[in-house]
Amino acid sequence: MATAAQLVAQRLYEAGCRHAFGIPGGEVLTVMEALKEAGLEFVLVKHENSGGFMAEGTFHVTGAPGVLLATVGPGVANAVNFIVNAEQDRVPLIFLTGCVDPAEAQTYNHQVFDHAALIGSVAKASFTLVDGAVDTIIDKAVSIAMDGRPGPVHIDISTAIAGREQPDEAPTRRVKPAPVAPA
C-alpha cells in the first residue's frame, strides 16, 4: 500500500509534472521524499514566491501543471503573491502545503494558521487531504487546474495524512477532457 504522499506524487508524475519547487520544512519532508521517489526533481529555492515563478516556467515549457511546495505558516504566506499572479495569468499550478495534524492545530500555535482560508480566497480551489479520498482529491485538483480557465489549486496535507497508508482500491478516474472539433 502507498502512503497519501506517495499517491499524490504518483498522480502528479502521471499528469506530466517532473519538477517541484519550494523550501523544506518539517511538515513537508514526507511529501518531498515521495515526490523524489515518484520521479519529480525537487528544486530548492530561496523564497516560495520565486519557486512559484519557476513552476510557472515549467508549465510553459512542458504543458503540465507547475508544482509548488510550502511548509506551514510563513512558507504558505510567502507564496500568496504568486498564487494571485497565477490566478490572474491563468497558470495551472498545484500548490502543496504542509500543516500540523488537526488535533495539534488547537494547541500548537507556532506559525499555524488556516491555510485554506487564505489560499482559497485567491486560488481556483483549495482542498484538505483526507484519508480514503487522496486519489480523488489529487485528480480533481489537476483537472480543475487545467480545465476551463487554468489556475492554481491548493492542497493542504497534514503530517499524519502524508505518511499514512491508503487503501489499494483504485477509484474511477475522471475522463480527461478532449478538444471538440468545430462543426
Task: Show the residue positions of the predicted features.
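N-terminal alpha/beta PP-like core and its mobile active-site loop of ThDP/TPP-dependent enzymes
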Residues: 1-183
